Amino acid sequence: MQHLFEKLFRAESMSQEESQQLFAAIVRGELEPSQLAAVLISMKVRGETPAEIAGAAQALLADAQHFPRPDYLFADIVGTGGDGTNSINISTASAFVAASCGVKVAKHGNRSVSSRSGSSDLLAAFGIRLDMSAEQSRLALDDLGVCFLFAPQYHTGFRHAMPVRQQLKTRTLFNVLGPLINPARPPLALIGVYSPELVLPIAQTLKVLGYQRAAVVHGGGMDEVAIHAPTQVAELNNGSIESYQLTPEDFGLNRYPLAALQGGMPEENRDILARLLQGKGETAHAAAVAANVALLLKLYGQENLRHNAQQALEMIHSGQAFDRVTALAARG
């Protein structure tokens, strides 16, 4: 391990295999806190490479609790969090709407990073159990088209890094790993990142990890497809990556100010999204979810974003998406 430390302290990049070896030791709790802090900061200052990020993700996936991976096509829709906008839980709502549109979503998530309510906080407020077994979650995915995988339940090795991360009080590689370590290992993913500089590197990382099709997005300060500003996209499709920009108009949607998407505490967000998913919500909220669902559906081969957004809006207005929330809660 010492040779890897010395390599990092010379500001040299690790290979994918070296990164996997190092992070396997981290999740086993084999590094001293001072060593872990030095590793994370040296990588941060130099800038983590896609190979290093992929190696770290592979180490955490190898250490994760097993999930019975389905053989049908399914996706994740998830953000890094930490964008500081304190918005409503767009990706969580989008998962239920996408399932209503007929696709399968295994959403990986955690407690809040920067907002007052992360996806897990919101689901708990809806009465959805965070500690469902992997088998129960797989059945929900089969039957309802949506399940939620609570990161700490599958990634116990994360706890070894937590004290150091809390003391450092700065973003490190761990802040981008969450969306890359879904234990169900989906072949498709829509991933939001907190910084535009991460869009292409994370898409390159998804290529290394073997994703079939994926889109990495950052929109006007948000780790989502935005309806207040252009969204930067890097789309991976069978090994090739295309970078482009999307505007709300590309989805046939109106623009709304970022302030229209302000969220609150988990109970407030629950009430906002309950109204939305029952077809009684704010038009800005519906548009934000429709844009994200539309891009997710594109990953399934539905290439027309305007048509996809319209399909999502119809599902939102029908109230069918909320039926999946109550059905998932009833499985507790």
From Swiss-Prot:
Keyword Membrane applies: no
Residues annotated to bind anthranilate 1: 79, 110
Binding site for Mg(2+) 1: 91, 224
Keyword Transferase: yes
Spans through the membrane: none
Functional summary from the UniProt entry: Catalyzes the transfer of the phosphoribosyl group of 5-phosphorylribose-1-pyrophosphate (PRPP) to anthranilate to yield N-(5'-phosphoribosyl)-anthranilate (PRA).
Entry protein name: Anthranilate phosphoribosyltransferase
Organism: Yersinia pestis (strain Pestoides F)
